[in-house]
Design a protein with these regions (language model features):
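Short, conserved active-site loops that position catalytic residues or coordinate cofactors/metal ions
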Residues: 26-41, 65-72, 231-233, 261-274, ...
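Short glycine/proline- and acidic residue-enriched helix-loop micro-motifs
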Residues: 89-96, 234-240, 351
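Generic structural signal for well-ordered alpha-helices
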Residues: 106, 252-256, 366
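Alpha-helix C-cap/termination motif
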Residues: 116, 188, 258-259, 292, ...
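Membrane-interface segments at or immediately adjacent to transmembrane helices
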Residues: 153-159, 202-267, 277-288
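Solvent-exposed soluble domains appended to multi-pass membrane proteins
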Residues: 244-250, 265-505
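Membrane-embedded alpha-helical bundles of multi-pass enzymes
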Residues: 1-216, 411, 422-425, 437-448, ...
Length: 505
């Protein structure tokens, strides 16, 4: 097994396979031990490499992770973006190759400045700190792509109880630390005191996670609310076709008129496929219907505003009936809602000129939505995958709501991964999450991240259920990731500036 730690393609191919295997730790497969194993394989493989060799090994790991975990983007490019199969594959490989640098650069940094082979305990701690910072960095750089975090593997695993303490990143940190410690236990046998410390660091988080799993950090703020989420299952090919707009509006109107009386009526992202000011008459009619039923209707709708004599378009969500508020999406999907380097790319191929791909970013510090006397934190599609952003809204809310249109990804696993991240947000916040989508998966999620009810994908249907407004804050909503970030910076600073001290550990 020495070839694992040595340079060369055998080790690089193993790193590629380890990255790819992470997919199986996440939804819909949920074989969570593979997340631990894949990190351990990468960690072991960096032990004897030069910085340049470590960089390429990390790149192989990242390419495997994104290649296996986000292949479903091909559906958007080919089926809906107009790219030929060959062009879609080329673009996708370039995308994977670029994202792989999120792992290549940290592994270079690790081998160049931070690795302490002679100090296994310090080595494991610093590796976990660097792992956390790379996850945070890829959720921030160039607006971020916070997909495939290792911590999501634990939604139903032993570490789930840590999510309300420190979010998905605390779980990722624990997985990386555990993987590195397991790889180093045999090297600590000659030093019983340090072996004991390693044992505590290894076991304590897992025992704590299991002990806190199911612990209620929040409590009800009122009586249960009845919910109806409308899943229209509108085909993406006709979504923005002017010839089909009236039919879509009639579909949601009729499904709502025939639905059971509830407190909250939820329509998915851009259920109203015309600008809000153009559809205001229709929205008012639906609002009066909702008010007569003592309901609030919440729907996705694009919004047009004039700012400094310039028109701006937003992906929005609005409330009518017994509620109020309009929210404008802040976290936009690259190429789907805006085109990076648009002067160069816009119009080059159909994929860079998708309908409604010129949205502006909504302002920060927007008020939450109000419905039935409660504050609702809104997340439009992609926004729910950002842990810190989601927490900033959840801390002011009684309920969480995410609306989405995952039709772009066909029958792939992309929507299942998306749902898993929404479940983690509910667990982190200790709040109920309503998830309404165009074609699935529409679901209600309880404060422990469990799906209480859902309806099948690819069907026109109405989901009925109850949610409970919640009050009080989980530790994660109070402190976010600041304590963990400070710990990681201190650990890495110690490794950089006090290498001699690390050698004695």
């Amino acid at each position: 097994m020495r070839w694992i730690t040595r340079p060369g393609w055998p080790g690089n191919l193993l790193a590629l396979a380890a990255g790819a295997s992470t997919l199986l730790a996440l939804a819909p497969f949920d074989i969570w031990p593979l997340a631990l194993l894949s990190i351990a394989v990468l960690y072991l493989g960096l032990r004897e490499l030069t910085p340049r060799q470590a960089m390429w090994r990390g790149w192989c790991f990242g390419f495997g992770l994104y290649g296996a975990g986000t292949w479903w983007i091909y559906v958007s490019m080919n089926t809906y973006g107009g790219a030929s199969p060959l062009l879609a594959i080329v673009l996708l490989l370039a995308f994977f190759a670029a994202l792989a640098w999120f792992f290549a650069l940290p592994t270079w940094l690790w081998a160049r400045w931070l690795r302490r082979n002679e100090a296994p305990l310090a080595d494991a701690l610093c590796f976990a700190a660097l792992w956390l910072l790379q996850e945070a960095f890829r959720g921030w750089f160039l607006t971020g792509f916070p997909w495939l975090y290792a911590g999501y593997s634990q939604l139903d695993g032993p570490l789930a109880g840590l999510a309300p303490l420190g979010g998905v990143w605390l779980i990722s940190f624990t997985l990386a630390l555990s993987a590195a410690l397991l790889c180093n236990l045999h090297r600590l046998r000659a030093r019983p005191s340090f072996l004991a410390v390693a044992g505590v660091l290894l076991l304590a988080p897992w025992l704590l996670g299991m002990a806190l799993k199911g612990h209620a950090w929040t409590k009800p703020a009122g009586d249960p609310l009845k919910v109806a989420a409308i899943q229209g299952n509108v085909e993406q090919e006709v979504k923005w076709d002017p010839a089909h707009i009236d039919a879509q509006l009639a579909l949601y109107r009729d499904m709502t008129f025939t639905s059971k009386p509830v407190d909250l009526l939820i329509w998915p992202e851009t259920a109203v496929p015309v600008l809000k000011d153009q559809a205001q008459g229709y929205i008012d009619v639906m609002g009066r219907f909702a008010a007569e039923r003592h309901s609030a209707l919440i729907t996705g709708v694009p919004v047009r505003e004039v700012v400094h004599h310039q028109r701006r378009y937003y992906n929005g969500i609005t409330v009518t009936g017994e509620g109020d508020g309009t929210y404008l999406k802040q976290k936009l999907v690259p190429f789907g809602e805006y085109v990076p380097l648009q002067d160069m790319l816009r119009g080059a191929i159909e994929f860079f000129n998708l309908p409604m791909s010129d949205f502006a970013r909504g302002p920060e510090d927007q008020p939450l939505l109000q419905a039935k006397g409660y504050q609702i934190a809104p997340y439009i599609c992609y926004e729910v995958v950002y842990p810190e952003f989601a927490a900033s809204l959840a801390a002011r809310s009684d309920l969480l709501l995410t609306i989405s249109n995952d039709t772009w990804f066909g029958t792939s696993i992309g929507p299942l991964q998306h749902l898993q991240m929404a479940q983690m947000r509910a667990l982190e916040a200790g709040r109920w999450m309503i998830r309404a989508t165009n074609n699935g998966i529409t679901a209600l999620i309880d404060p422990f991240g469990r799906i209480t009810t859902q309806i099948p994908q690819f069907q026109q249907a109405v989901l009925y259920g109850e949610v409970v407004p919640m009050q009080q804050l989980t530790p994660y909503l109070q402190w976010r990731s600041w304590p963990l970030a400070i710990l990681c910076v201190l650990l890495l600073g110690w490794a950089l500036l006090a290498g001699r001290i690390a050698k004695t550990v």
